[in-house]
Amino acid sequence: MCGRYRRTTAAEELARRYHIPIPPQRDLPISWNIAPTQDVLAIRFNPESKQRTLDTLRWGLIPSWAKDPKIAYKTINARVETVDTAPSYRQAFMKRRCLIPVDGFYEWKKVLGGKIPYTISMKNNSPFVFAGLWEGWNDPSTDEWLRTCTIITGEPNGFVRGIHTRMPVILSEEHHNAWLCGEAGKEILVPYPADRMKAWPISARVNDPKNDDPEIVAPVELESVARQEDSPQLL
């Protein structure tokens, strides 16, 4: 699963990088420790204007038919294996897709006696995007619309497998348009190339979303973990 990530590239730079002509609705501050139910930036496609937009969505998808918004705690991730058939996601998979800009994400490696958090990112330190879905939900108590999203997860590549049994689906740039416009299906939702990624162990401070600062990703020396055969390469 993916339950924590960071977005440290400013919205203005993301708009330039991902060819978004329309200014973001709201310039969310960067965050080193984004957690479920928080507001996040997402890239969507407007079929009328034929343009991309950079919008604010709530992480944790609430289906349009949901009675209780607390379902969002269970829908932060959509499994690629069932994303096109599961009741919570199948309509969004057909009509409401998004890209979620990221600079790195966190996964916890099970070790004897507990778990060790790792930060995972690109070797060239560039931002990248998760494949996501979004939905609109009308709050019956206020009659206000809330737009929410989920991150699609799948099998890990050979690199991330040394840390966790799942990983978010990362889309290469050549697939961005096809995903947003609905021109491609699950065939592009595959593990990202392992040789482009890096990871290292970090402090357990990341466990608390209140800890939101650059020190979150400071490397931690874990010689005993690094000696294990299935440990990822530390870069």
Language-model regions: role of each:
Residues M1-L235:
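Short linear sequence motif anchored by a di-proline
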